Amino acid sequence: MANTETVLKDAMTSIDGVIGVALVDYTSGMALGTLGGGKELDLNVAAAGNTDVVRAKARTMELLGLKDEIEDILITLGGQYHLIRLLKGRGKSGLFLYLALDKSRANLAMARHQLKRIENDLEV
């Protein structure tokens, strides 16, 4: 099992094309940890904004009567992928991993696979 800092470093080094990664508490909208980003990508702003995305999707599913769980949410921009993976398991409720990827260098299927592995390694 790995702590927040370790899994963020793992994401930055094991996933091709990563621009930044964050562990986010979507009950508060606060990033519990961030790595990467920069002036073009403020990960704390992204954490708060993507919290709204997660809440909106959960609310929509409730209104539709869908009895399922969100695994991940993909937002595709012109030059980037933004991947949000909701975490499951003891101590992980209310958390998501947020990953921003350079579209020209990333392999989306592998990024999703690696995020799932990283989720399993994370101990909160």
Residue ranges and their predicted role:
Residues 1-124:
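Non-catalytic interaction/Regulatory regions outside core domains
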